[in-house]
């Protein structure tokens, strides 16, 4: 991917230009970990989740998806990230996983995790659609070294 390099644990390092683009598109993106946290220890995993989502979001922006699609995917990713943090609290085995493995375990080809508290079937279907796109992206993109 142009403008990105592979960092530690397979994380992508986002260029300053891409960081600025994300800040314009989703000004509260860097606040997501704070909004997801149950306790202070959740900030680092939350930041890692946001870092894992950034290349996908940049891919959407580069493909010039509609504003409606982008906003829907942002909203869905926000819910998925919060659910990933919640699952880390609910399952000690999940809390031990590195974030990339947690994402790989909970974001599958057929959708994402069931969101709790329970949401409508329509909302869950939208989240599953976003998760399928994220899964395809994560499993078909090749990091530039």
Residue ranges and their predicted role:
Residues 1-145:
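Charge-rich, intrinsically disordered N-terminal extensions
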């Amino acid at each position: 991917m142009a403008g990105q390099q592979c960092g530690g644990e397979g994380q992508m390092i986002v260029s300053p230009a891409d960081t600025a683009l994300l800040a314009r598109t989703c000004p509260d993106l860097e606040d997501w970990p704070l909004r997801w946290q149950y306790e202070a220890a959740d900030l680092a995993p939350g930041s890692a989740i946001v870092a894992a989502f950034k290349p996908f979001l940049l891919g959407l922006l580069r493909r010039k998806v509609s504003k409606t699609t982008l906003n829907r995917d942002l909203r869905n990713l926000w819910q998925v990230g919060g659910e990933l943090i919640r699952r880390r609290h609910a399952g000690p085995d999940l809390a031990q996983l590195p974030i990339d493995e947690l994402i790989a375990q909970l974001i599958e080809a057929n959708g994402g995790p069931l969101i709790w508290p329970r949401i409508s079937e329509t909302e869950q279907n939208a989240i599953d659609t976003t998760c399928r796109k994220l899964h395809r992206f994560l499993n078909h993109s090749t990091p530039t070294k």
